[in-house]
């Protein structure tokens, strides 16, 4: 809900809209509960610290702000990222019921948390061992497409992330992917990337801007700002 309200207000700002509806959304946004950390360091799922009846439950709705949302980031809220990590580790360490579409969510969450090897391991053991020839997945005896849809997103998140002010290159590269090449990866801000790496290190990057403007790149902690022109690489 918070992300929806924020995106709505940002869109209204860009479009120059300021009316009763925007005022109402702003007021409602202030009433939303803020992310809270429990005494054990995990991100709280509820407004109270309630005992879980199923510690390994597959749903991770309270971690939405980390993935696919971007309210929780390492740059701005590192303490909440730590809480998300503890929450996910807790689920995975308590006989996590990995099945169905939640597999895609957790796989992508691990990629965003820069747990590349864990993310790839979940892809290989929980997807590719259960996949049907048509790429549907065996979800408790029934074919399901939703969980496999999470695989491309997780793969991209391992190689490129653009949910913050920066575009991070190879942020979560798995050890097994020491050499590789990708073309046509789209990043927020209307940028298209081609990249190649050897021995886990980036050796070339080509960036095409579809609308021009500033591009903030980050690789291994170093930031480079580029001024781009529409339609040019």
Where do the protein language model's features map onto the residues?
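Non-catalytic C-terminal accessory modules of carbohydrate-active enzymes
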Residues: 117-232
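Active-site core of glycosidic bond-cleaving carbohydrate-active enzymes
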Residues: 2-166, 203
